[in-house]
Amino acid sequence: MDAFETDDLVAAQHRPGEHTYTDFLRRETLSLGMSVWPAGGEDTQRPHTEDEVYVVMAGRGRITVAGEDRSVGAGSVVYVATGVEHRFHSVEEDLQVLVLWAPPYRSRAGASASGEAAGR
């Protein structure tokens, strides 16, 4: 069985004031990661080559997806389709976000390592 505690995932990657991302599960059809954006931090990600589902576990901020903006906090779930512009912003409290990728992150040919690595 693969089982994880999000608190442990966050603690293992914690670097105060920095955005961090860790892949922790990868299968043929999907992958999971934990991303943390610090309060006041900047999200510099670019569109990805995979669909994403963000599940906000803790914190508060805002997200813009394809020009549509909304607030997010613990319990928010946001779907982002392949290739769509999206960005977290106005982070008031460190955002801890579970990220589901389908297919797995960077699994599609031609994925831009330089563009995607910055923001996941």
Indicate residue ranges for each PLM-predicted region.
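Ligand-binding loop in jelly-roll beta-barrel domains
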Residues: T82-S107
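Short, conserved beta-strand element in jelly-roll/cupin
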Residues: V36-P38, P47-I63
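Structural motif
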Residues: R27, V53, R60-R62, V65-G67, D69, E85, ...
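Short acidic-glycine-tyrosine-enriched beta hairpin
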Residues: G67-T82
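A short, N-terminal "cap"/entry segment at the start of jelly-roll beta-barrel domains
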Residues: M1-M34, T44, G110-R120
